[in-house]
């Protein structure tokens, strides 16, 4: 099937059915043989998600009436066409003819003239895209802009801008295979430009690469993991032979990093999502690491764990993922304002429950890939107020010792947006 038709189908699944792009895109990429075509399909889908309000408005201006019902797929096809005309180097005639052909392949023969007409109209007048509202100016939903303005009055615009940048590719060196310097030297030998990141195992690539081209990647010499996420294992600081729980473990990057740091630990990796849990096992297998992988609910540990309390717990809590919009731009359209309070309540339940399963004297690291205070600073502040045996351990990375935890904003040191708070349980 024509590449533009596949793009329209993936975007339809995201915007009309609420499927995440990380699921919808690979589903359509299966139909393409060449890596080049798969990359173009990804560029079209991600590009549309980044610029959706502006290109939807521009497309609507050239339509006599909105497309509804079964014709929504053609609406998605038109915005794919509009994106090509404004944001890619694809020659206009090719973009238009290929998009019209996609309309045929989607079995809407009667709409081909409409698609042709709308796209030719746009091409004739490539006027600047509308910025008459903040949603249009920033290609971001109004509710999220409002929350960011409140949380970051001095730099909310920069945070939004960083969230639209194309994300860099980070690697985590597997210290059980080689030192970071040795892996950097191996990359250099292959003329792959890379530099050391802030945390001990982090490597930042100057340009994204296919993992199959990286030295000994498939044999477990390194993993793909953003620089911000790599702090989790370092901050939890596993010690020899400890019993450690990774409470929301999928897809398993942090579990694997914990085992790389301290192979003698007994690690229990748990997740509520059975499908994503398969990825945890795949990652462990590639890196030749061992953990007990359990399908279970971190808010109901009693139902799947009859062992003793844990020495350390990593709680990478379910969250809005507002810190990783640059990697997952569909989050802007899948998340809704009311989700934030619902997520904060879920986080509260999981945090309180995990705390009961932490040994006296133990450490719990609370983490999210959110940049919203309701899920981070406010969440931990409320937890400390209601939990007598909990104490916040100041992290050296914090901007100030008065801060509650460490908030990383998108693009800071080239990292994703992330939050960490390290909590210590009293010994008495």
From Swiss-Prot:
GO terms for biological process: regulation of DNA-templated transcription; rRNA base methylation. Keywords: Cytoplasm, Methyltransferase, Ribosome biogenesis, RNA-binding, rRNA processing, S-adenosyl-L-methionine, Transferase. PANTHER family: NOL1_NOP2_SUN FAMILY PROTEIN _ ANTITERMINATION NUSB DOMAIN-CONTAINING PROTEIN, NOP2 YEAST -RELATED NOL1/NOP2/FMU SUN DOMAIN-CONTAINING. GO terms for cellular component: cytosol. One of its GO terms (molecular function) is rRNA (cytosine-C5-)-methyltransferase activity. S-adenosyl-L-methionine binds at residues 248-254, 271, 297, 316. The active site is at 369 (nucleophile). InterPro entries: MeTrfase_RsmB-F_NOP2_cat, MeTrfase_RsmB-F_NOP2_dom, NusB-like_sf, NusB_RsmB_TIM44, RCMT, rRNA_ssu_MeTfrase_B, RsmB-like_ferredoxin, RsmB/NOL1/NOP2-like_CS. The gene is rsmB. Belongs to the class I-like SAM-binding methyltransferase superfamily. RsmB/NOP family. Specifically methylates the cytosine at position 967 (m5C967) of 16S rRNA. Pfam families: Methyltr_RsmB-F, NusB, RsmF-B_ferredox. This is Ribosomal RNA small subunit methyltransferase B. It catalyses: cytidine(967) in 16S rRNA + S-adenosyl-L-methionine = 5-methylcytidine(967) in 16S rRNA + S-adenosyl-L-homocysteine + H(+). Signal peptide: none annotated. Its EC number is 2.1.1.176. It comes from Shewanella oneidensis (strain ATCC 700550 / JCM 31522 / CIP 106686 / LMG 19005 / NCIMB 14063 / MR-1). It is found in: Cytoplasm.
């Amino acid at each position: 099937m024509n590449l533009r038709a596949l793009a329209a189908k993936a975007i339809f699944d995201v915007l009309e059915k609420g499927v995440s792009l990380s699921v919808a895109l690979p589903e359509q990429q299966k139909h393409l043989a060449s890596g080049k075509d798969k990359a173009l399909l990804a560029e079209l889908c991600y590009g549309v998600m980044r610029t959706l309000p502006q290109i939807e408005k521009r497309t609507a201006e050239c339509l006599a009436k909105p497309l509804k019902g079964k014709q929504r797929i053609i609406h998605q096809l038109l915005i794919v066409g509009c994106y090509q005309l404004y944001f890619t180097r694809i020659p206009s005639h090719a973009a238009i003819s290929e998009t019209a052909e996609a309309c045929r392949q989607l079995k809407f023969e009667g709409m081909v003239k409409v698609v042709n007409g709308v796209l030719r109209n746009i091409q004739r007048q490539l006027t600047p895209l509308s910025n008459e509202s903040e949603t249009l100016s920033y290609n971001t939903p109004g509710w999220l802009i409002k929350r960011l303005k409140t949380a970051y009055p001095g730099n909310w615009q920069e945070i939004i801008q960083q969230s639209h940048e194309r994300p860099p590719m980070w690697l985590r060196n597997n210290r059980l295979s080689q030192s970071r310097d040795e892996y950097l030297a191996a990359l250099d030998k292959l003329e792959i430009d890379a530099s050391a990141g802030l945390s001990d195992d982090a490597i930042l690539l100057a340009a994204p690469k296919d993992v199959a081209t990286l030295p000994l990647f498939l044999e477990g010499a390194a993993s793909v993991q953003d620089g911000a996420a790599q702090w989790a294992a370092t901050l939890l600081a596993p010690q020899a032979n400890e019993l450690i729980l990774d409470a929301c473990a999928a897809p398993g990057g942090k579990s694997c990093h914990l085992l790389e740091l301290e192979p003698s630990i007994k690690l229990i990796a748990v997740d509520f999502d059975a499908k994503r849990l398969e990825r945890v096992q795949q990652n462990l297998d590639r890196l030749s690491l061992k953990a007990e992988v359990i399908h279970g609910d971190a808010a109901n540990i009693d139902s799947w764990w009859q062992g003793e309390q844990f020495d350390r717990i990593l709680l990478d809590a379910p969250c809005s993922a507002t810190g990783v919009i640059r990697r997952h731009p569909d989050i802007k359209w899948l998340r809704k304002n009311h989700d934030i309070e619902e997520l904060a309540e879920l986080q509260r339940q999981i945090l309180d429950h995990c705390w009961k399963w932490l040994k006296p004297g133990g450490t719990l690291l609370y983490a999210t890939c959110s940049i919203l205070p309701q899920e981070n600073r406010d969440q931990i502040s409320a937890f400390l107020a209601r939990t007598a045996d909990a104490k916040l351990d100041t992290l050296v990375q914090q901007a100030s010792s008065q801060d509650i935890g460490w908030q990383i904003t998108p693009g800071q040191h080239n990292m994703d947006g992330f939050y960490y708070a390290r909590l210590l349980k009293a010994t008495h």
